Regions:
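N-terminal beta1-alpha1 ligand-phosphate binding loop
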Residues: 33-57
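Short, glycine-/small-residue-rich phosphate/pyrophosphate-handling segment
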Residues: 45, 136-174, 245-249
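Active-site rim beta-loop-alpha module in soluble metabolic enzymes
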Residues: 153-201, 205-210
Length: 249
């Protein structure tokens, strides 16, 4: 019996309807590279939201950005048990993928980040790490919007490991599920409420969205708050683009 695929993929193609090139011409043209963005939960709505949010980072002759969904993942990663459950499936996915030049783990808990880095010589980016580092380039103190209260302790442990807890103004929860943040009609309204609290009460000068499922709300949230809002998946893919481009320079 065939094993189920590790992931499903959303791939953008720009070559449909074009005239094929001679084989010799193709071999002389270096590949622009490929970045694989992995949603470690199995919610396809989240992956579609990521794919749409990453469209501004796709450009002519640039690396291909492919978003995929981890078939073995839970519907949402909301507990430490959820985090641990996807570590080895992510490692196997990275080891089995010989066509990607960089990987992005699109979950704010950065599940399996170090384990995946051990499994490949290619760069692996975690969105929490990249989102926080990007926020520090925009503000002295940043705030984080979490999906729920129980996520915050996990995020705090990670910030302590990074040595950056003193730069955190505060982290406040939406008290929503991952699925609700990706598709709920009230998500943006609630994010604006929490973002205003981070800005006015806690002194945050930038806000990091603490869940990949929030990706589609970055721009309207930034317009409402009037301070930088960081989508950590966009931040991670931007870093991956730089890594892939410079590796081919």
């Amino acid at each position: 019996m065939n094993n189920p695929p590790l992931a499903t993929q959303f791939e953008h193609r720009d070559d449909v309807g074009t005239t094929s090139q001679p084989e010799a011409s193709i071999s002389m043209t270096a590949s622009p590279g490929r970045i694989r963005v992995v949603n470690p939960n199995c919610n396809e709505d989240v992956t579609r939201g990521l794919d749409a949010a990453l469209e501004p980072l796709r450009f002519a002759n640039g690396p291909e950005i492919v978003c995929s969904t981890l078939a073995e993942g839970p519907f949402g990663i909301e507990t430490q048990a959820d985090v641990e459950s996807v570590v080895m499936p992510l490692r196997r996915l990275v080891e089995a993928d010989n066509s990607s030049d960089a990987f992005v783990i699109a979950c704010y808990s950065d599940p399996g980040l170090q384990v995946c880095r051990e499994g490949t010589t290619r760069p692996v980016f975690g969105i929490a790490e990249c989102g926080v580092l990007t926020a520090l380039t925009r503000a002295d103190r940043f705030g984080v919007i979490a999906i729920s209260q129980r996520s915050i302790a996990r995020h705090m442990r990670y910030l302590l490991q990074m040595g950056l807890k003193d730069r955190l103004a505060s982290e406040r929860p939406l008290e929503m599920s991952v699925a609700e943040t990706a598709s709920g009609d009230q998500t943006l309204r609630r994010m604006v409420e929490v973002g205003r609290q981070l800005k006015a009460r806690d002194g945050a000068e930038a806000v990091v969205m603490g869940c990949a499922g929030m990706a589609r709300h970055r721009r309207p949230l930034e317009e409402e708050l009037g301070i930088p809002v960081i989508d950590p998946t966009q931040a991670a893919v931007a870093m991956a683009l730089g890594a892939v481009q410079f590796s081919r320079a």
